[in-house]
Amino acid sequence: MRIALELAGQNKTYESLALKFFEHYIYIGAAMKNMGGRNYSLWDEDDGFFYDVLRYPDGSFEKFRVRSLVGIVPLYAAETLKMDDIEPFQEFKTNFLWFVNNRRQLTESCCHYLELEGKQQYELTIVDNKQMRRILERLLSPSEFLSDYGIRSLSKYHELRPFVFGHSEVRYDPAESENKIKGGNSNWRGPIWFPTTFLIIDSLRTLGA
């Protein structure tokens, strides 16, 4: 969305694309908190973390309680839209405000209006303050995600407590994997990824601002 608005400064066609990205963001954020209109959320209140969810043919759901980067990614989806910044883009501004005002059941959970120093702006974020604090408790814990060199792709919690589903398991295994699938690659089993660590830092700066 931000890239599309930047391009819209040279080509107004990109305004409609920016709006499309905004609407998709809202739809995805709302679905994460109310899957299939059944009031089932990817967020787990007991664990304070986001999980993947499996939906069975009978309509029931089951969370995959794997503490991985998947549960941290919602932090990335944070952006600030200042009304002064979108003033030059009248098509985007008009449709943006219409969507915010007429789709409140969707936008109220991930699009928040603020006034700071007399300036109007909207904060776009999937996580609320309470969820962010609970995620950070795990993210900044050396016994979970925080290592001396960055953020682990899988919590160290799973070193002694692997997640088991059927005949498969996910265990913290940051070196060469015991499983030879894909040549023994263990990227999702604990190693540090430089790009994701950067994205986490950048997202926290955005949320903090």
Residue ranges of model-derived segments:
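Acidic, mature catalytic/reactive cores of soluble proteins
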Residues: 1-209
